Amino acid sequence: MSRITKEEIEKTKCGRFLLSDENIYLSIYSLNSYVFEYNLLNTEDRILYHRLQDKFDARLINGVITRVREQIIELFDKDKYIEAKVYFKPKKLSENGELEFRPLHSTGLITQIAIVSMLHLFVYEIPEEEEGDPKLRLSNLSRLIPSDFYGNRVSVKPEYLFKPWKQQYQKYNQNSNDALMKYHTSLEYKYEVTLDLENFFPTINPIIIYRYIINHLPAYLNDEERKMMKRVLQKLLFCKLTTTFDEKTAGQYYKVTKGAGNYDNVDKIEQNEKECWAFKEKSDKFVRGIPQGLPQSYFLGNIYMISIAEIFRKKFTGVSYFYVDDSVIFTNDVREDNFKEQLKELNKQIADEANNFEDDSAIYPEGTEKFYKSDLYGVNVHLDGKSNYTRLDNLDDSEVYLKCISREMSQAGSDFFRMYSDEENRNLEEKLDVLSKQVKAKRDQLVEEKSQKRDSGNEDAIEKDEDDTQKFEKRLTRYYRFFEYRKQRLVAMHQPENGSDEDYNMQLY
């Protein structure tokens, strides 16, 4: 692929739309909805981000449109790719006590606007050029996203690239909680299955998404239009990595997970990682998998999940809910004595599905074929711990309540680290206050019921329920502390707004 000029790009309808002022302005207008990692922007880009909140500063907007257009044209050069840095965000402690990290990618603000301008070709229908004031319409690809996918759904409101994640995550939690309570009562489905994909974004082979999208482009596109779409898609999928690793960070980034359960020992896994690292030292570094943190990754992740979700639904028929790579399924198809084998069968079906996609080395950036065909790639379901099932007929009302609250904890924890404004801060503070009071009321109710049982003198009933009640009470206390601590930290963040230290201390304590 040699570099082409602006005039050559604009020979196609999709090329004219790509470079148009209207398309690039739309990317600027929806800026707040896709800059997911604001704190990773440099100072200059943060200033530009805030200046771009004024969507009617014509001089600034026109200057940004020109810079974005130039960057898009530059990316059509054969050897030019989106350049990204990777940062490691603490994720959890492993079973052996080591801290694990999630790799998050970031790039300049102009580049992110260029990415979204390119992504528009795939998420929206390209409007007819004679349309005076075209409305946003979802593309064929966007309409393929199943209705039970809640995360990162494309919006047709110009101020949002994706539907607001908070509302969508809340819907996911609320609907799955409602289903839990419904099927716990009716037992139409006897099991709740939760499936977790291991190291999801880094283990997606971009070639699979490339083939899926190309196979689902509109049939009416002529050869030149399809060629243009392929070129843009390749630039969205393959990103250069500008971060320099030491051995420790390289081990985190290039950690092998594909088929890890099939290795005889840890030494083989470590040797595989060293081979991948040695290869990376000798070549231009490219982002592993899909670059989580950049705007295109979440739409591309949903596209990949379409076939994964279909495999899940066939294995566990019933009612399902998906949020990116998290899933909850209510089903009757669990083999209790052989659940792990069912998970292994899922992994085999996922691998078989991946092998069905035609490979083409010409699609890979030059010199990267070995990297993209290595054992770094291959999405797997966790075989232990995170993927599990729960028998609904074995749950009492208190356990159903705890499962629902645990989902609220997950959402609140995510909200806490993704606030960018005082308004979001206060909204979350109010939500945490409500949750804290609800849990405290439930805990107080439990203590009162326990006291009444003791007063009744029914020793058999007391002894029978004591252990379960104590466990329930401890978990409620832990949840209460979780919500209350985060609420108090939010109060502390805006102490100056609260007036005197006395007022502040009253709120805090």
Question: Where are the language model's segments positioned?
Answer:
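Conserved two-metal-ion catalytic palm core of "right-hand" nucleic acid polymerases
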Residues: M1-T244, F279-R288, T469
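Surface-exposed helix-capping loop/turn segments at secondary-structure junctions
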Residues: E128, K314-Y321, N356-A362
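Nucleotidyltransferase catalytic cores
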Residues: M1-E74, E100-F101, S106-Q112, V123-Y124, ...
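Conserved polymerase palm-domain catalytic core
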Residues: Y183-V324, V328-Q342, E429-Y509
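Inter-domain linker/hinge segments that demarcate the starts of reverse transcriptase
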Residues: V64-D77, F339-E358, D375
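A generic structural signal for well-ordered alpha-helical segments enriched in polar/charged residues
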Residues: H120, Y124, N215, S307-K314, ...
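Extended charged low-complexity segments that act as oligomerization/scaffolding linkers
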Residues: P158-Q170, N177, Y183, L346-N356, ...
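An acidic- and aromatic-residue-enriched active-site/binding cleft used to recognize and process polar
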Residues: K89-K92, L109, L197-F200, Y323-V334, ...
